[in-house]
Each structure stands twice: as C-alpha cells, then as structure tokens.
C-alpha cells in the first residue's frame, strides 16, 4: 500500500509541475519555473521509490496516463484550453488502456518452499 501512495504522490507532483510550467509561460513570474523544477524532480523521486514494489510498466503507465488525463482536464479548467472531440476520444482510449493495464497485472503467487529432507 505504501508504494501505491508513493505512486499517487508522484502523479500529483507531475501534474503540479506540468501545470506550473504552463502558468510560468503565461506569467512574468519565475516562481512557476522554480515550482516546476521542484515538483517534477519530486515526481521522479517518488516514482523511483514506487517501482521498488510496483511493476515498472504498470507504474509508468499509470503515472503518465493519469497525469495526461488530469493535466488535460485542469488545463481546460484553469487555462481555458480547448477540448475537441478528438481529444475526448483520445482521453477515453487512455482511460480504457489504464484500466486494461491495471487489470492485467496480477501479483505473483508465492510457491510454498519445499522442505529439505534429511538423508542418512
């Protein structure tokens, strides 16, 4: 569970960093660039710890997929970016892909260790 929390923190940091980049590009303040640098760095740090127990392909797909989905939604709400039918179709496909990747991942079952038999 701890590693899933780290992955969630990585996703939040990625979203915050990317939105900060956009904010910095439309404002005259350098604070956005500093926040972007810090948050994207934290995102990679959290992701690197999360993949200790979460399969890399699953963690990366969730990190990027959920990040893209939420960044797109927030950019529409915060920066008045357009959301076309093609973007909606792409986001829907992305959600389906995330669900398929996550549902196709199973924990490996632990094989019971054979007991060593003493030989005489």
From Swiss-Prot:
Pfam families: Multi_Drug_Res. It is a multi-pass membrane protein. The keyword Membrane applies. One of its GO terms (biological process) is glycine betaine transport. The chain crosses the membrane at residues 1-21, 31-51, 54-74, 81-101. This is Spermidine export protein MdtJ. One of its GO terms (molecular function) is antiporter activity. It is found in: Cell inner membrane. The gene is mdtJ. InterPro entries: Small_drug/metabolite_transptr (IPR000390), Small_multidrug_res (IPR045324), Spermidine_export_MdtJ (IPR023740). Its main location: membrane. Belongs to the drug/metabolite transporter (DMT) superfamily. Small multidrug resistance (SMR) (TC 2.A.7.1) family. MdtJ subfamily. Forms a complex with MdtI. One of its GO terms (cellular component) is plasma membrane. Keywords: Cell inner membrane, Cell membrane, Membrane, Transmembrane, Transmembrane helix, Transport.
């Amino acid at each position: 569970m701890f590693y899933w929390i780290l992955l969630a923190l990585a996703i939040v940091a990625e979203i915050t960093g990317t939105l900060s980049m956009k904010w910095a590009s439309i404002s005259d303040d350098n604070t956005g660039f500093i926040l972007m640098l810090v948050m994207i760095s934290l995102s990679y740090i959290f992701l690197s710890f999360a993949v200790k127990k979460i399969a890399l392909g699953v963690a990366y797909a969730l990190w990027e997929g959920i990040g893209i989905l939420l960044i797109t939604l927030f950019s529409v709400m915060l920066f008045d970016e357009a959301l076309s039918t093609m973007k909606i179709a792409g986001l829907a496909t992305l959600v389906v892909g995330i669900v398929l990747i996550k549902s196709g991942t199973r924990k490996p079952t632990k094989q019971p260790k054979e007991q060593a038999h003493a030989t005489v």
